Amino acid sequence: MSSSLYLINPIEKSSENITGETNLLEHFNLYKTLNEFNSKHLSSTYKSYVKNLPGDNYIKREKSKHSSSSSSNNNNNSNNNNNSNNTNASGQQDVNMGVPPQQQQQQQQQQQQQQPQQPQQPEPPKPPGGLTRLVEGNFFDENQQELILLSLDDSQLRSAFTLLDGGYQRPDKDKKRDKKHRDKKKRKHRDGSSSSSTSGEKKKSKKDRPDGSHHHSNSNNNNSGNSMNSNNMNNNNLNHNNNNNMNHNNMNHNNNMNHNNNMNNNMNNNNNNNNNNNNNNNNNNMNNNNNGGNITVEH
């Protein structure tokens, strides 16, 4: 395959039909820019790109089919012509066996006059189809005219026809997903500084450390103090609960003691009352006895 197949034909101004399209092309100077684009840019990128397309094999197969079919048609036509000539010659020989030569010449002239001369017309070429139409054909589509009518600058045309060889382009979804991981903390020695250089240095004492280290230790101490305070508070709560329970038990014990004392006092009071009652009864008996002794008999 020739290398000219991969190059777009130069755009030339048609002198016969001057229409609005040609005036626009002249106005925006697109003839020059497009021709330069075809000669410079496409010769390097587009040509190498199209050569590696999988459709090249298809174009070759399609070409071989056309060539084989045309050669077979030519062979068939030649064979048919030879057969017809042979049959005509043999038929004329059979008919002209018992005819004098003058009459044979007259008959041949009459046959030539009856059969008008038919010039051999070549078969019209079939328009190419498939990928060959895109690569080899000089057919201009209506959409192509609309593309040419666009008022584009040279840089815009180049960017429009430039092949993107940047490799895989990440979609926006992946970019949004990766934004979450950007705020991670940086690892040590990320910028190439080796750990061996820092290992030789002596460890800094607490006095030599920057303020941030003191702050870090203070924060640890504060955290430990907070934890101790929380433990003390828990202990206080336990003591408070224990004291409350002990006080509550003491109060119950005191109440029981008071209740028992009151019961005993009541019992004692009742006993005292009973004793008083007994004493009163004894006094009454004694009074009765006295009264009985003082009885006088009246005459």
Swiss-Prot record:
GO cellular component: nucleus
Protein family per UniProt: Belongs to the Mediator complex subunit 19 family.
Cell compartments where the protein resides: Nucleus
Keyword set includes Glycosyltransferase: no
GO biological process: positive regulation of transcription by RNA polymerase II; transcription by RNA polymerase II
Coiled-coil parts of chain: 260-291
Gene it is expressed from: med19
Subunit structure: Component of the Mediator complex.
Skewed-composition ranges (Basic residues): 176-190
Domain of life of the source: Eukaryota
Keywords annotated in UniProt: Activator, Coiled coil, Nucleus, Transcription, Transcription regulation
Region of interest called Disordered, as start-end residue ranges on this chain: 60-133, 166-299
Keyword Secreted: no
Compositionally skewed regions (Low complexity) per UniProt: 67-86, 100-118, 218-299
Regions of compositional bias (Pro residues) in chain numbering: 119-128
Function: Component of the Mediator complex, a coactivator involved in the regulated transcription of nearly all RNA polymerase II-dependent genes. Mediator functions as a bridge to convey information from gene-specific regulatory proteins to the basal RNA polymerase II transcription machinery. Mediator is recruited to promoters by direct interactions with regulatory proteins and serves as a scaffold for the assembly of a functional preinitiation complex with RNA polymerase II and the general transcription factors.
Name used for this protein in its record: Putative mediator of RNA polymerase II transcription subunit 19
Lineage: Eukaryota, Amoebozoa, Evosea, Eumycetozoa, Dictyostelia
